[in-house]
A protein has these predicted regions:
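Conserved N-proximal alpha/beta basic substrate-recognition cap immediately N-terminal to
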Residues: 1-73
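Short acidic/polar capping segments at secondary-structure boundaries
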Residues: 11-12, 52-56, 79-85, 103-105, ...
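General beta-strand structural signal in soluble alpha/beta enzymes
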Residues: 47-49, 76-80, 99, 135
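Rossmann-like NAD(P)H-binding beta-loop-alpha module
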Residues: 70-94
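Phosphate-binding site of ATP-dependent enzymes
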Residues: 85, 91-185
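ATP-dependent carboxylate activation and anion-phosphoryl transfer catalytic cores
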Residues: 184-195
């Protein structure tokens, strides 16, 4: 083995069928242990993307802090499970706010997409007590960028999320008809991405 392509590993699809269901967390942990073992055994090989980097990338607060520290503009952000704090932040944002998962989705590889909160959802915000989440001021956009860094090479694509109904908030929601095109980003942005 000379190189490892490690991109979005998934648990076996039939794991959700495992009976009794109490065994699922155990088996899930065994797969995580396998991936960690491979990361150690193959540490001297080329990884795309390195296992431990992917683990760090799952930590959204860490990502936000890094982005802010290297000079990217980061939306106003609140991480909490306190509904009163969410209500205060909602007012601060003028009712223009999104909610995101704090981490990756462990539930059968399902994704909970970024959602723009409405007055109706804010009336039910007490449910946030069950689990912390990331709340951010909504920023309108013309399109979204997906940037991939491999070594010192930076590849960017523009995702035309605003022209595809259902994708205006989160391009991943219904990505079948999305137009994606190469995009030239400024050198200063490239440098920050490599940093």
């Amino acid at each position: 083995i000379d190189a490892v392509w490690y991109h979005k590993p998934h648990l076996p699809k039939n794991l959700r069928l495992m009976q009794p269901p109490e065994y699922r967390p155990f088996v899930s942990k065994q797969f995580r242990s396998l991936w960690e073992s491979l990361a150690g055994l193959l540490a001297d090989k080329i990884w795309v993307s390195p296992y431990w980097n992917m683990i760090r990338a799952e930590n959204k607060p860490h990502q936000l802090a890094i982005a802010n520290n290297i000079g990217f503009e980061v939306p106003e952000t609140l991480i909490t499970s306190n509904p009163d704090k969410v209500r205060e932040f909602w007012k601060y944002c003028g009712g223009e706010m999104v909610v995101k998962m704090l981490g990756t989705a462990p539930m059968d590889d399902k994704v909970i997409y970024t959602t723009k909160l409405t007055d109706k959802e804010m009336k039910e915000i007490d449910s946030v007590k069950l689990s912390p989440a990331i709340f951010q001021q909504w920023i309108s956009k013309k399109f979204e960028l997906r940037i991939t860094v491999v070594g010192d090479k930076v590849f960017a694509v523009a995702i035309d999320s605003q022209s595809c109904p259902g994708n205006e908030i989160d391009w991943r929601h219904q990505n079948k008809n999305l137009k994606i095109r190469p995009y030239k980003i400024p050198e200063i942005i490239k440098d920050k991405c490599i940093e």
